[in-house]
Curated annotation (Swiss-Prot):
Classification via InterPro entries: CheY-like_superfamily, GAF, GAF-like_dom_sf, HATPase_C_sf, His_kinase_dom, HisK_dim/P_dom, HisK_dim/P_sf, Sig_transdc_resp-reg_receiver
Residue numbers binding Cu cation: C176, H180
Disruption phenotype: Enhanced ethylene sensitivity and early flowering.
This enzyme's EC code(s): 2.7.13.3
Details of cofactor binding: Binds 1 copper ion per dimer.
Compartments, as annotated in UniProt: Endoplasmic reticulum membrane
UniProt-listed Pfam families: ETR1_N (PF25487), GAF (PF01590), HisKA (PF00512), Response_reg (PF00072)
Disulfide bond positions: none
Protein name, as recorded: Ethylene receptor 3
The protein's required cofactors: Cu cation
Function per UniProt: Ethylene receptor related to bacterial two-component regulators. Acts as a negative regulator of ethylene signaling. May delay the transition from the vegetative stage to the floral stage by up-regulating GI (GIGANTEA) and RCN1 and cause starch accumulation in stems by down-regulating the alpha-amylase AMY3D.
Organism: Oryza sativa subsp. japonica (Rice)
Main localization category: endoplasmic reticulum
Highest taxon, organism lineage: Eukaryota
Amino acid sequence: MLLSTWTPGCFQGNKILLRSLITWYYLEFMPKLRPFYFLFYLTLPSCATDSPPISDKSSSIFLPLAQQQQLVHWMMPPRFRCQDYLLPLLLALSPAAAAAREVEYHHCHCDGGGGGGGGGLWSMDSIFRWQKVSDLLIAAAYFSIPLEILYFVAGLRHLLPFRWVLVQFGAFIVLCGLTHLLTAFTYEPHPFMVVLLLTTAKFLTALVSFLTAITLLTLIPQLLRVKVRESLLWLKARELDREVVLMKRQEEASWHVRMLTHEIRKSLDRHTVLYTTLIELSRVLGLTNCAVWMPAAGEMCLTHELRRDGGGEDGVVGVDDADVVEVRGSDGVKLLGPDSVLAAASGGKEEGTGAVAAIRMPMLKVSDFKGGTPEVIQTSYAVLVLVPPAGKSWGRHEMEIVEVVAGQVAVALSHATLLEESRAMRDRLAEQNRELLQARRDALMANEARQAFQGVMSQGMRRPIHSILGLVSMVQEEALAPEQRLVVDTMARTATVVSTLVNDVMEMSADSRERFPLETRPFHLHAMIRDAACVARCLCDFRGFGFAVHVENALPDLVVGDERRIFHVLLHMVGNLIGRTEPGHVTLRVRAADDDVLDDRLGQRWDPWWPSYSTGYSSVKFVIGVKRQQNGDAGSPLSRRPSGKGIDLRLSFSMCRKLVQMMQGNIWAILDPQGLPESMTLVLRFQLQSPLTSSSLGGSFEQKHSSPSCQIAGLKVLLIDDDDDINLVVARKLLEKLGCVVSSPPSGSGFLSSVGSSAAAFQLVMVNLEMKRVKALDVATRISQYRSGRWPIVMAMASDQKAWEKCAQSGINGILKKPVILQELKDELARILQST
């Protein structure tokens, strides 16, 4: 039908339909060029403007209405083939078609002749003018479109593979613009050249149009692939968008976790940590309530809650509850059911609340942070319950936030517990330190009291005893009767024992392991027994006891041992026997004992501890017994343990036995049926001393004293002591007894300066190390500065033999231990003079 109506007269009317068909094709398969085609379509001229009107009525530019309807229906795409779209289009075109049919185009201006008819808006002149203006505007628009396409191509270099299509489009648009420009000159009389140019332009336009259409047919598969690629890229973009959303959520969750961790770790108090956790979780997650349940004695107790409503719940849930067991047995977040007791107790049953979540929090112990092998300790778990508002669902990132926060809270609680225990330990250490300081102050006070006691003992007992010993030693040098000498020797030995006891008390200290030091030297055993018997007889006579002594003739005389300690033990045995019984008769028996007897009593073989500078040893047995007058039968031997009646006896006997054991001996007692000591036995082993070496080892009390040697006689001695009591007088008498010329420096403020200058005139300077107002070591050091050659010789007097180390550093030549006895003084002076 379209071909049957295709006449030269209607060519101009049907050309717009062909253009519409081409435009629809491009717009359907090239949607990205729709803006350009839309603009191109708007600028298309109507069929009446492409050529001058034709006067032939049969060659009208409009087709019949039925043919136009069929052509439009065929041209439209399938989705537009509907009567609903076609009817409004025909109604819009019907007025113009009716007006065009009524007008007769009998005026033709091609040659300048013809007349026109009609008037008003629809006159031929007006229509021609409008067509001319429209053609000029269309030409201007067509000429500008290629410039825009070139600018577009310059900005999108990646579209260069389609440059030929763009060039064809540009040529097509330029030719269309040229056609409209030439058409504008055909509304007035014009030469044949204009018609020829117009025909050529239209032919070229048609040719370029068909070439462009053919080129587009080859590009359609590529455009389809681009469409598929666009779909894939769109799907990829959606996936990337989802990943970006997830990343943003993860970043937001990480930020919330960091913020919560920072807030939780601000404090090291357990309660502050828990309340901070509840507040921050509620703020970040928008929760209605939060609660913490702590384990205690087989149940879970509600200890911390964000919102306290004061309800009827008692805040206690059993640890055997199903939800509690499940939550404490899993690592992640668990959503509680609607009938959960734990959720109801945490406020999850109230109106406006959603699904309740819970998670466990491990309560770490302090032992988990200590080194070494970890102990197997059952981990305790607390429960954190989260109550959201109604309609809120738990997302994955929110659960991750809760899990991370629960772990951080567990670590913060463990740190808080560790800090609390550290503070408690610090408080305990501070209390112990205060106790130690108090004990130190008490010890210092006790030491001061002990020193004060020692000072009193030294002033009240030791110094008088030393004076007595010095005087007795002088009396011993006189010509005495045998009975007088016995008494004097006994007094000297007794005073020596008392001095030893006082020294023991004075030198006793808390860190001293050797409370009873031994001084072994050769002595005469017979003389010691005689003196002990003399003192025992005096004690027995004083208490109303009889006394007898039996000494074996084969008993060795010159032995090595500590005669003062042995004398002390014998007197102690006599005192114990006569102090707790009725008056009777005391017997002292001394004999040599076999080694087997001593071995049987000791239960071990004898290991001699003395230096072996003799040929043998001898055991001596001392037996002291008492016989009461009421019964004559002696009791059988009983246990060596003393009775429980006398505490002093037990203490004295234990100390005495310890002293005997130090001398490698043994002592035991035999008690009567009443528990009183009936006899006491002392067994000691002595090293035998040959008479040839007795003089080199110090002699004894019975040694004959020769007259002062020529070196000691006439020796100028300076005696330095700031005390003017009897000790200074006794020391002077002893030196004068030896034939020395004794002088003493004046006391006063210039004592130290006068001593240094005056000491050079003396041969011997004796310094008392126990001076109160002056330091004896400073005096000795000052004297050594004025020494010329070997004179003066400096000798110190001290009660402590250990002071020799300090004296040697101060230039002191020798030390004389107090009490000063005449024979010991003579021996020490002879040794010093011989060595210098």
